[in-house]
């Protein structure tokens, strides 16, 4: 009987130690995660905002889900290299969304050592020449692509951002009055 009680006690001590260790690891992880800067907060809000699409049903995260390495969340589609529907469910993109987790590492499109490197999209068309960053140029594409978020113009995108809950943050990052939709092309470059 004492041996059973002893084993039970030892099991409880081990379980308790594991729980305390797990709690410590989780709290340490939380402390190690730095707070987002205002521009990072704004980017995160834009990335997850489904209202920035034709039908209010698709965000960047719809096809680049952080939970699955920033690619599409449907494993069957990913396994077969198929495409995802856009904001208009009758239209489909022209390729499976690539993982966006490493996207910031591509650099400017350039010819180096006999090969083209850098840029964004499969064909490098977001070169970085316009905004100085191919990732920033790439991020603009899906909003106006009829196969993706399907908005019709930079003005429509600007108005949707202006109707969002983060206009004060947008002004904090880009300056008061930055969401002037009469200057939608300039606003589009900031989004």
Give the residues covered by each predicted segment.
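Bacterial N-terminal signal peptides that target proteins for export
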Residues: 2-14
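Periplasmic c-type cytochrome electron-transfer domains
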Residues: 14, 18-191
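Intrinsically disordered, low-complexity regions enriched in serine, threonine, proline
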Residues: 1-2, 26
């Amino acid at each position: 009987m004492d041996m059973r009680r002893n084993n039970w006690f030892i099991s409880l001590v081990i379980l308790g130690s594991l729980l305390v260790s797990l709690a410590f690891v989780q709290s340490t992880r939380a402390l190690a995660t730095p707070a987002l800067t205002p521009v990072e907060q704004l980017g995160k809000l834009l990335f997850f905002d489904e209202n920035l699409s034709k039908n209010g049903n698709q965000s960047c995260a719809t096809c680049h889900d952080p939970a699955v390495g920033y690619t599409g969340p449907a494993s069957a589609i990913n396994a077969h290299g198929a495409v995802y529907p856009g904001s208009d469910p009758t239209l489909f993109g022209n390729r499976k969304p690539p993982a966006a987790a490493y996207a910031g590492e591509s650099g400017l499109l350039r010819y180096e050592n006999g090969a083209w490197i850098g840029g964004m999209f499969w064909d490098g068309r977001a070169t970085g020449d316009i905004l100085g960053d191919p990732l920033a140029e790439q991020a603009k594409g899906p909003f106006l692509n009829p196969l993706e978020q399907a908005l019709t113009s930079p003005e429509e995108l600007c108005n949707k951002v202006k109707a969002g809950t983060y206009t004060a943050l947008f002004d904090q990052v880009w300056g008061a009055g930055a969401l002037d939709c009469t200057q939608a092309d300039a606003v589009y470059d900031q989004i």
